[in-house]
Amino acid sequence: MSDENLLTTLDTYLASGIHIGTQQKTEDMRRFIYRVRADGLYVLDVRKTDERLRLAAKFLSNYEPEDIMAVTRRVYSVGPLKKFGQVTGINTVAGRFVPGTLTNPSAKKFAEPEVLFLSDPRVDKQALKEAIEIGIPVVGMCDTEHLTAHIDFIIPTNNKGRKSVSLMYYLIAREYMKNRGLIGEEVPFTYDDFLEKAMNVKVKMNSAPRQRGRFQRRPRR
C-alpha cells in the first residue's frame, strides 16, 4: 500500500495504531476488517479507514460548527476532543453526558444539534440513545467489536488508543476546515497538538457542552 491519495502517510497511520482492533468482531464491522493476527487481534483495513475519514469530514462540513455536537466519555479522547472543538468551533461534551441534554427542553444544558459525532457507540450510549429519539444523524468512530445498527456513518478505527484517537480528531478537524474553505494547505495546528492533549489524562471531565452559540434546530436536509 502506498501513500498515494491518503490523508496522511501510511507510516503515520500505522504508528498511531488506528488499524489495531480487538479480539472480538461483529458482523457489522466485518467489511472493514483486513485480517486477524496470530494473537487473535483483528486488524482494520487502513485504506477503508482513510476513505471513511474523508467522507465523514465531507459530510460534517455540510453543517455549521454550532449545529454539530461531538461527545466522548473515553479518558484518552477528552483532550483531543477539546482541541477538536477549539480549532473547529464545534460544540463538544467531554465526560459524562447528562441525560436529557437532547430530549428535555427544561434541562439546564439542553441543546438541539443537527448531527451527533461519537467517539464510541457503546461508551457514548446515552448520547446515541437521545440522538435516535430526536432523529438526527450519527457519525461514530467504531472498533471491530461494535454494533452499528444506529450509526449512520461509521469511521472504522481503534478508538481507544491515545495516538489513534488523536490522529482521528486531527484529520477530521483538518479536512472539515478545508472543506468549509476556512484553511488552505497551511494548517494552523498539528497532529502533535492533539497528541499532547491525549497524553494529559488528568484533564478534568466536563459534562457541559462548549457554548459557541445556541443550537437552533433547522429543517432536515
From Swiss-Prot:
Keyword Nucleus recorded: no
Gene3D superfamilies linked: Glucose-6-phosphate isomerase like protein, domain 1 (3.40.50.10490)
Pfam families (UniProt xref): Ribosomal_S2 (PF00318)
InterPro entries registered for this protein in UniProt: Ribosomal_uS2, Ribosomal_uS2_arc, Ribosomal_uS2_CS, Ribosomal_uS2_euk/arc, Ribosomal_uS2_flav_dom_sf
GO terms (BP aspect): translation
Keywords of the record: Ribonucleoprotein, Ribosomal protein
GO MF entries: structural constituent of ribosome
A GO CC annotation given for this chain: small ribosomal subunit
Domain of life, per lineage: Archaea
PROSITE patterns according to UniProt: RIBOSOMAL_S2_2
Family to which the UniProt record says this protein belongs: Belongs to the universal ribosomal protein uS2 family.
HAMAP family documented for this protein: Ribosomal_uS2_A
PANTHER family: 40S RIBOSOMAL PROTEIN SA
Protein name from the UniProt record: Small ribosomal subunit protein uS2
Organism of this sequence: Methanococcus maripaludis (strain C7 / ATCC BAA-1331)
